[in-house]
């Protein structure tokens, strides 16, 4: 049997250790895993889904159900394997998000949203003792870093997709409406409002709050932020990331900075709470699998059973399975940083995500529309107003309805 997932080193280790335990219990089953970091992963899996040679069990992004199996053709309806996989362990809302084309195409591993993480070791060096709680705090941090630490130090760095999410967070906070209709993907914002959002991101770069993408690329090419020398050594002192990424970023810091890693506060940029929560990932069984019952048994082991759930812990986020969460907590396997971040996200976010927002043509590193938009801004190739046209054309091309 085969299984695939993406993630960082600690997630790879958890999956592999859990698989060893599963094989010890099921000696007639051998599991071959395939795994890597996120960069380029969706393109690889999309090709496998189209070719019909994807793994039996796949860790999937929520929007993949819409992108690759909107007709229910790629993934097994898990209601048909409820004898092997206990579907009663999940809340209806989380399960409903994975119900597409009249089919329970995956079970949610965890729910997630975005939050700020800060390296307070560097902030303290800049004379700042509290995490930023407002836009004014962010702008003041940019000024302090530049003046006290120098041009090479920044309060945070965000890649293009991260900038898009923060821009939407800002607009939702200011205007109190979802980015787009969560069912029809009809955009809820005007060109002027979006230009305002892009200008907000530009102001963070201009104010030395965020590193210019051109500067980042020249030093790191396409290296992920947590693997960059600037993050590891504390020159980049903040990120806006999924709550489940806490371990990946904290463990990457060198010894001089590790103790400074801190879960920040959600920032209100207007009268409303911005941001969304979503199914962070699911586990699905491909319709090309020849061992569907065994695949369902493996998923149940990883997410619902004591041995599996206590090993997986919070490596894929805070478990959405009620049984899995209890077993992980009892084993002390839920990382406090992830739990703290998730609790803050879930208490704050109220907006819904539409299924096209994470379309790979929009969010892909290096080639996506979001990348093009924010590259153009940082390279000075477009004004915010011009960048809006690029963004809307790209959104329309993947199926958004532009009002």
What are these regions (language model features)?
Residues 340-396:
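C-terminal capping/gating helix-and-loop segments adjacent to ligand/active sites or protein-protein/ligand interfaces
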């Amino acid at each position: 049997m085969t299984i695939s997932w993406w993630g960082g080193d600690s997630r790879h280790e958890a999956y592999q250790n859990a698989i060893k335990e599963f094989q010890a219990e099921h000696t007639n089953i051998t599991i071959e895993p395939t795994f890597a970091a996120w960069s380029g992963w969706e393109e690889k899996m999309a090709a496998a889904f189209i070719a019909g040679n994807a793994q039996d069990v796949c860790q999937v992004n929520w929007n993949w159900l819409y992108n690759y199996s909107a007709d229910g053709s790629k993934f097994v309806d898990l209601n048909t394997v409820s004898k092997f996989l206990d579907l009663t362990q999940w809340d209806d809302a989380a399960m409903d998000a994975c119900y597409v084309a009249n089919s329970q195409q995956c079970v949610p591993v965890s729910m997630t949203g975005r939050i700020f993480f800060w390296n307070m070791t560097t902030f303290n060096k800049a004379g700042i003792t509290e995490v930023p709680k407002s836009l004014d705090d962010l702008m003041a941090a940019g000024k302090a870093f530049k003046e006290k630490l120098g041009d090479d130090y920044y309060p945070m760095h965000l890649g293009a997709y991260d900038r898009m999410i923060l821009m939407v967070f800002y607009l939702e906070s200011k205007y109190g409406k979802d980015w787009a209709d969560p069912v029809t993907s009809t955009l809820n914002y005007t060109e002027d409002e979006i230009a305002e959002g892009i200008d907000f991101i530009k102001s963070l770069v201009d104010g030395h709050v965020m590193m210019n993408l051109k500067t980042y690329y020249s030093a790191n090419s396409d290296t992920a932020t947590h693997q960059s020398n600037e993050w590891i050594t504390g020159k980049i002192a903040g990120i806006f990331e999924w709550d489940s990424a806490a371990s990946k970023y904290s463990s990457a810091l060198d010894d001089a900075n590790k103790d400074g890693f801190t879960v920040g506060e959600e920032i209100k940029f207007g009268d409303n709470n911005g941001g969304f929560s979503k199914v962070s990932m699911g586990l699905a069984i491909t319709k090309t699998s020849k061992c569907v019952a065994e695949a369902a048994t493996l998923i149940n082991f990883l997410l619902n059973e004591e041995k599996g759930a206590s090993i997986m812990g919070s490596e894929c986020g805070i478990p959405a399975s009620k049984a899995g969460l209890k077993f992980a907590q009892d084993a002390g396997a839920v990382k406090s940083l992830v739990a703290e971040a998730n609790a803050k996200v879930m208490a704050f976010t109220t907006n819904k995500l539409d299924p096209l927002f994470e379309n790979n043509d929009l969010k892909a590193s290096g080639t996506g529309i979001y990348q093009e938009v924010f590259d153009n801004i940082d390279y000075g190739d477009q004004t915010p107003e011009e960048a809006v046209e690029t963004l809307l054309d790209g959104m329309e091309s993947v199926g958004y309805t532009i009002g």
